[in-house]
Amino acid sequence: MIPGSNPGGRIHNVIEMFENYFMDAVKGYYRHLAIIESQDPLEKINSLIDDYLKVNKKPRVIYGFHPWLDNSKDRMKELKKRFENFLDIDYSNSEKYLGQSADLVILDAMDDFRPNYIARFVDMTKGGGIAIIYSDNILEGKLYKKSLTRYGVVKDLFEARFIELAKRYRGIIFFQGNDRITFTPYSSNETHKPYKKIPKSPKVSMELHELCLSSDQNKVLEESLFIMNLGKRVLVITAARGRGKSASIGLFLSYLMSEGNFGSIIVTSPTYYSSQEIFKFIIRGLEALNVKYKVITSRDGKIMKISTRDSRVKWVSPDLAKNEEGDLIVIDEAAAMGIEFLDYIVRSWDKVILVTTIHGYEGSGKAFLKYVDKLKGKVLLKNIKMDYPIRYAKGDPIEKFLFDVFLLDAEPHEVEYNGKLKIVEVPQEELFRDDDLLKSVYGILVTAHYRNSPDDLMLLGDMAFQKVIVGYSSENPVAVCQVVYEGGLTDKQIWDISNGLKNEGHLIPHRLIKYMRALDFGKLKGWRIMRIAVSPENQGKGIGSRVIEEVIKMAKGVDWIGSSFVADYSVLRFWIKNGFLPVYLSSIKNEELNGYSVIVIKALSERTKEFVVKLSSLLKDKLLRTSHQVYYNLNPQLIVLLLRNTYSERIEGEVPDLYVDKIKAYTEGKVPYNVIAEAAHFLVTKHFLELKADLSIEAEASLVARVLQGKSWYHAGLMLGLSSREVEDNVKQSLGVLLETYT
């Protein structure tokens, strides 16, 4: 180990020692990470680069920064002069570069030390390469950290843990100030390079196997042939990041296109960039097979469609994918799409390929794996797991560091709930002081929610205006609730929000002020339950409700408790069961989360109750008037749940006699539905405003899908898991019941 200090500032002599370590990294195909915290970091960066260039004379370089900040372009240009192959990337656009790799990756952290960017860029580093993060001071003057700061108060718990682990882990070079270096070497003897393993008699073309970089990729090519057999089939590919799963599927799709077995293939993903590697490798595969193809690109250069003589593959957004038809659909980053979406696709298509990351910086796939287990009993399903990384060797020390410092694979202890629950607030300092406790608590959050990111861990540690409440059973955490203080805004803050300015620290007041124009709501003080999670083996035992009950007791001097989450039937039902009412549903789908945001509130003061009545009645009115347009793709059962649990401040008049006669004619089979559509709409609207009839959730969802959303019988059936005939039977019978009730 290099000593922790280097007296006299003779840092160049120490840096010269790294050449041998860099050579060993090339041999073992593993990476180094250098973290430089210094007022003059460029001198140290250049010295490290000098040593690295002795090992790799013409490296590919990726440089991440915020180009719009003072001096950032000057720093970038100073380093760019040294290289021929240099790509500079704006942090804000870095998602576009998923799948890119480089020998040398440099992160400018002078203005922003953001976990998401660190994880994404360091992951771009190839085996034998080095990632360099440089900053003047990791703790101060950083953009993401400012978003966690309120009234000048913020903590440093995330950074303290980051620095501590960086100094302790091997393969990491840590410079602090002008004369301190911490570094413990790694060895090529501890790594295993990826290797291809082509079957002796492959069924998939040898040219495609030759393009593979690992035995796992060869395995995917051969075993994916499962999808070509007769009958309804689901193929699942799971892996950690960097295993080449998207590339493997791209090569396999090129094989299908060359064979002409599937004329129309759809690819969808949370964003286009999640699946761009699939399209790159379709092209590489087709070229290796000497198959002629045509490419259609968007104005900004995205490959949207690839066609051969007998086949075509195109990317479509998730919403449009619901209404597409074809021979095969591929869903990349499937776990991010939500179980409801996946269920719809699996019901609608005979051939489905689900590709997803497990334990990556984009989230945990635990809920997805549970879904896959349930599917096994319903359809023919094959799950292929990929273990070997292709960008670097197995055993790479930097992957180990990233997983541990960002808790990417954190999992809670399996604890059998004994019926006794101790619920306490755990100070953030205690949480970050005890790594086992932190892993267990964060693991519960990660396993319960797919969309986690390294940023979430920094928020948990650094944001001061929050509570972390933990439920223990047998001395082990089984539930976690993260509460953020919101509201109590000044007139100036309310004016700013109402005029379009951001206020990220107050999510619920922000949405209700900006979009519902409930300006005075901002003055009320509230607690937003940012996350509540129960360990997987203990869900469905009432633990979450017990925790919420305790949180309500803790909320002294608070006007409201609320939560905001992606609209999901079971999640919304949980909140309603615990006395929370929906007051807001976003009008635009959050593409990143693949859903609409819902806000629920439990009023703890009379003033809040007035707002809840008003806002929830406006929400009901909006759903009744715009489900055919704004909420056409929303789950009809979810709409029913919202309509049944919101207030009504208006009523419809009596049902006109003409409408009664028309609906009777329809229920008796004398006229088709389209003839009586306006009468049905009037009657269904009246029902949800007055809620006097007792209908099943399936019956009401059928009414919502056909009457309020305007779906065809076929698409209504797909949404509800029913046949077209079953949906129409539900609608006829339900309209008959409503006539009896409201006339």
From Swiss-Prot:
Which EC numbers does the record give? 2.3.1.193
Positions binding ATP in this chain are: Q217, R391
So what does this one do?
A: Catalyzes the formation of N(4)-acetylcytidine (ac(4)C) at the wobble position of tRNA(Met), by using acetyl-CoA as an acetyl donor and ATP (or GTP). Catalyzes the formation of 41 N(4)-acetylcytidine (ac(4)C) sites in RNA, almost always on the middle C of a CCG motif. Modifications are found mostly in tRNA, with small amounts found in rRNA and mRNA.
Q: What is this protein called?
A: tRNA(Met) cytidine acetyltransferase TmcA 1
Q: Which InterPro entries match?
A: Acyl_CoA_acyltransferase, GNAT_dom, NAT10/TcmA_helicase, P-loop_NTPase, TmcA/NAT10/Kre33, TmcA_N, tRNA_acetyltr_TmcA
| Listed HAMAP family | tRNA_acetyltr_TmcA
Task: Write out the catalysed reaction.
Answer: cytidine(34) in elongator tRNA(Met) + acetyl-CoA + ATP + H2O = N(4)-acetylcytidine(34) in elongator tRNA(Met) + ADP + phosphate + CoA + H(+); a cytidine in RNA + acetyl-CoA + ATP + H2O = an N(4)-acetylcytidine in RNA + ADP + phosphate + CoA + H(+); a cytidine in tRNA + acetyl-CoA + ATP + H2O = an N(4)-acetylcytidine in tRNA + ADP + phosphate + CoA + H(+); a cytidine in mRNA + acetyl-CoA + ATP + H2O = an N(4)-acetylcytidine in mRNA + ADP + phosphate + CoA + H(+)
Q: Which UniProt keywords apply?
A: Acyltransferase, ATP-binding, Cytoplasm, Nucleotide-binding, RNA-binding, rRNA processing, rRNA-binding, Transferase, tRNA processing, tRNA-binding
Membrane-spanning regions, if any? none
Q: Which Gene3D superfamilies match?
A: 3.40.50.11040, 3.40.630.30, P-loop containing nucleotide triphosphate hydrolases
Q: Which domain of life is it from?
A: Archaea
Its GO CC terms are: cytoplasm
Give the organism the record lists: Saccharolobus solfataricus (strain ATCC 35092 / DSM 1617 / JCM 11322 / P2) (Sulfolobus solfataricus)
Q: Where does acetyl-CoA bind?
A: I532, A533, V534
Q: Which GO terms describe its biological process?
A: rRNA acetylation involved in maturation of SSU-rRNA; tRNA acetylation; tRNA wobble cytosine modification
User: Which subcellular locations apply to this protein?
Assistant: Cytoplasm
Q: Which family does it belong to?
A: Belongs to the TmcA family.
Domain called N-acetyltransferase: residue spans: 421-605
Q: Does the keyword Acyltransferase apply?
A: yes
Q: Which GO terms describe its molecular function?
A: 18S rRNA cytidine N-acetyltransferase activity; ATP binding; mRNA N-acetyltransferase activity; rRNA binding; tRNA binding; tRNA N4-acetyltransferase activity
Main localization category: cytoplasm
